[in-house]
Amino acid sequence: TAFMITSVFSLGCSYFETYQMQQIRAMGTTADVAITSLSEEQYEELSRSSLVSVVGVSQRLGSIDTSGMDDALLSITWIDETEWQEHRVPTISDIHGDYPQAKNEIMLPTWALRAMGIDDPQIGMNISLSYQLGTDYQYISDEFVLSGYYTDYSASRAGNRGAAYVSELFATQTGLPFDSVSTAMI
């Protein structure tokens, strides 16, 4: 009887943990709240607040021209170290390489690489992309270096929508105002 009760509780706990992980992966973040159009002052206030345990920043800088990639939609996004480590890494797997550091580095989910025709990605390989920044709909063609790639589970929920991660240096050099592109992830 004790064995049976222990087995039922073990199975129940394992099922709950697995279900919870599936939900987190489908959402693509462990954050509970997103505050859009965040000002730098609001970010500082949230960071100092004892009511908030973790505040990450996500900046949607623009989008990639995905016209040759079926129905995929990719944003160009920069996230800070806190957002990456605390909110995003727990929701992805099979991480190869590192988060971008140099201006021309990019990190992509494997489903996006496959949509680009890249089935065997290599760290350091060049990837040519056209993208637009902010509300300027003029596309820029540029060459990026793949700094990393990973398995993303949220694309199936979001219908092949995802992010191409870029470096803080890239984000800074866009000149886009902080409050027009920033979201606090809590």
Predicted regions and their residues:
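Basic-flanked hydrophobic alpha-helices used for secretion and membrane insertion
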Residues: 7, 12-186
